[in-house]
Amino acid sequence: MYKNKNGTWCSDFIMDGVRFQRRYPNSTETEALKLEKEWKEAIRKGVWETNVSSARGVMKLSEALSFLHDRYWKYLDDTTNYRVCLNRVIKAIGDKEVSTLTTADLYELKDKMLNKGVNGKIYSPHSFNSSLVALGTALRILEGLEVVKFKSKPNFKGLQVRQVVGKRPALRDDELLRAKEFLYNRAKKSKALSSVELYELFIVLSNLGLRPAEYFAIELGDISFEYDTITISKAVKTHKGTGTIIGAPKNGQSRTLPCGENVMEVFRNIRHRLEIARSVSKVEALKLLREIKGNDVLRMTYYWVSQGAYDNCKDLPLDKCPITHLNHDTANRMWWAVRNHLGYLGTSNTHGLYVLRHTVASRLVKLKGFNAYKLMAFMGYSDIKSSLHYIHLNVDDIRDGVGISV
């Protein structure tokens, strides 16, 4: 097991005179080692080669999809992309035999997805290009394994469609302040912990530009209250099925960010709630709730503890407690009210939670001396990862300039 120059963990070993290689995108070292161990066991048991030999012969697209998922794609971090794309292809041109596919089938796929529609749906150029790439990758792997032999090999050249990338939306300063006021007032009036946590999420995301999935994976131990920094080393992977699964960030690397006073105040409030929640039982919290007068913040904390909101932290060390109960679905559903308040009505999700990340990025590039390389380091973008080793962020400039100081 080794890490390549892009920061991706890779396998490269020899068994019975055969060399095996594989990459594990967006996986931590522990996850990659586990996947490599499972792979080696499959090879030793003979399952690996049996899969290839049994697949030779007539194979339809749906069978190819299952074969490639079991052999390759289930080891990738994003397990849905290839399946979704190939299922689109099957819906558009039918479950054809792989070896009989021709260039004409590719043009039929293009015409149906972009012009005629598939079951009444017209797909975007991005969706078509993704499906085309997935199909090309599948055919290349199958041909390389000699699972199929094409009667007339399809030519993918020149089929991709030009994509016009629109400008990423960002909120104006006045919109950020209106959103902050809206969330603050709702949190103050409501007894719901989720309303308070959405306000806290807004403060952090509008200052640090985290991906929502990164915020949902933060534990108290990721925050340095001594140095006013936060380390982002995890993200929630929502595409792997039911339940919360924590993996590496999108670029596979951790980063440490400086936090302004407004963000640290949020983190200190969260720590205070967690300390209280772990120090009293639900019965004790209910008793204290009835006894304490005047301190609304403390009363609400006891109320939430008495209702069992922090039961998930009782058996955890303090630094392992998650800082929020929100997840992707609840946060986005609650954010919809903010969109409507700002006047962004309709079903378009251009001003979803991710707009806060785009807003921070647009503000950072305006800082003096904050170039594109520093932006990519701060935001955790996946490209130019090899350049991140040479980036030296001006911590004081970032802390003073990032966010809106709400």
Where are these regions (language model features)?
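A short, basic/aromatic helix-end/turn motif that makes direct DNA contacts
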Residues: 25, 217-223, 376-382, 390-393
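Conserved tyrosine-mediated DNA breakage-rejoining catalytic core shared by Y-recombinases
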Residues: 218-276, 280-294, 298-300
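Short amphipathic helical patch at the helix-1/turn junction of helix-turn-helix
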Residues: 133, 204-207, 365-366, 391
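Catalytic-site neighborhood detector that most strongly recognizes the C-terminal catalytic loop/helix
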Residues: 170, 236, 372, 379-404
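Short, basic (Lys/Arg/His-rich) helix/loop patches that form interaction surfaces
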Residues: 185-195, 257, 275-377, 381
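N-terminal DNA-binding module of tyrosine recombinases/phage integrases
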Residues: 4-10, 15-107, 275-316
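N-terminal core-binding DNA-recognition domain of tyrosine site-specific recombinases/integrases
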Residues: 2, 24, 28, 69-147, ...
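Basic, Lys/Arg- and aromatic-enriched nucleic-acid-binding interface segment
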Residues: 148-151, 155-212, 216-218, 226, ...
